[in-house]
């Protein structure tokens, strides 16, 4: 544990940020699952609507560095290909 006051504050801040980032990553996974479920149901309109919700979120979080930009691009590409195949 840190002894210096600023180090203690940094430690607290990093723990809070870690919880927030974990929450955001969990949200991304949940939204991706919703898109995949919509694709499996075969409803193109529903899957496109779900995809339109997740696309800007992936872009935003990849720009902020929460997820890697290539990972965001891969998810968007794979989901869009599956939607177009419907």
Curated annotation (Swiss-Prot):
Residues 1-23 are annotated as: Disordered. Keywords: Ribonucleoprotein, Ribosomal protein, RNA-binding, rRNA-binding. One of its GO terms (cellular component) is cytosol. The keyword Electron transport does not apply. GO terms for molecular function: small ribosomal subunit rRNA binding; structural constituent of ribosome. InterPro entries: Ribosomal_bS20 (IPR002583), Ribosomal_bS20_sf (IPR036510). The keyword Membrane does not apply. It holds the Pfam family Ribosomal_S20p. PANTHER family: 30S RIBOSOMAL PROTEIN S20, SMALL RIBOSOMAL SUBUNIT PROTEIN BS20C. This is Small ribosomal subunit protein bS20. It comes from Buchnera aphidicola subsp. Baizongia pistaciae (strain Bp). The gene is rpsT.
């Amino acid at each position: 544990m840190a002894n210096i006051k600023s180090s203690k504050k940094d430690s607290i801040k990093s723990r809070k940020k870690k919880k927030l980032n974990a929450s955001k990553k969990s949200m991304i996974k949940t939204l991706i699952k919703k898109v995949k479920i919509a694709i499996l149901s075969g409803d193109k309109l529903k899957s496109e609507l779900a995809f339109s919700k997740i696309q800007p979120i992936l872009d935003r979080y990849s720009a902020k560095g929460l997820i890697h930009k290539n990972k965001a691009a891969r998810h968007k590409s794979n989901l869009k290909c599956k939607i177009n195949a419907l």
